[in-house]
Amino acid sequence: MSAVNKVVEFSKYRNKHSRDSKYPLQTEGSFFGKGLTDETMMELSKRFSNPISEMEHRNRCLFLVMSTTGMRAKEVVSLRFSNILKAPSGETLVSYIRKGGKLSYSVISDKVLNSLKEYHSLFDSNSDYFFLSCPGRNRAPRRPLSTRGLQKIVNSWNVLTCLGKKIHPHSLRHSLAQKLMDTGGGHFCSRVLNHSSPAITSKFYLRPYADPNRYLNWNQD
């Protein structure tokens, strides 16, 4: 293949040059590429759009919560209905303890809340937790979903990240973060992720390049 037609994948190029101290990499964008593509996110959204079984309803709710809040796995499985609040400005919030032991809030859309109610309407349960285990063949009682259980569920969705790695719960946080960084900017993304500062968010998710062609229209060809 000629040099003109040979295009190296960005991730391979970056990994190769990360070992070259002569040309140190930018610190920005260290998590760049660890999320899912827009196409994969839309594929998952469509896959979970018409649930029938309890497991399918749970998959839809998990995808909606993780893809709209960017919560970590431990935070997702800790969510409770008793921690749902109404903000003074009208938004529905859920409170939780984030990494570092600090109280935080995330917005829960009507779509997410209605999906959670549909999921819980499938069985007679007084559980306060958003997500529960499924009884399975042994008809074991439902219990609050564990972090390990969440990991297995998300792995079973069987899609790959931008870097070709198998999906895991944090992939959805990366996906949301990259989308918000690109469209809403560092301050907004930082607030949604509950980072301590926008500088931390930029370190992880600011792309190591920018495409000016999105804004330039000098050429009329």
Predicted regions and their residues:
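Short, polar N-cap/turn motifs at the start of nucleic acid-interacting alpha helices
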Residues: 84-86, 164, 185-204
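DNA/chromatin major-groove-contacting recognition/catalytic segments
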Residues: 15-18, 203-221
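Basic, Lys/Arg- and aromatic-enriched nucleic-acid-binding interface segment
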Residues: 39-69
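Active-site/catalytic core of tyrosine-dependent DNA strand-transfer enzymes
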Residues: 41, 110-163
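DNA breakage-rejoining catalytic core of tyrosine-based enzymes
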Residues: 23-44, 100-110, 124-128
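Short, basic (Lys/Arg/His-rich) helix/loop patches that form interaction surfaces
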Residues: 48-53, 151-191
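Conserved tyrosine-mediated DNA breakage-rejoining catalytic core shared by Y-recombinases
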Residues: 78-114
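Short hydrophobic short-linear motifs embedded
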Residues: 6-16
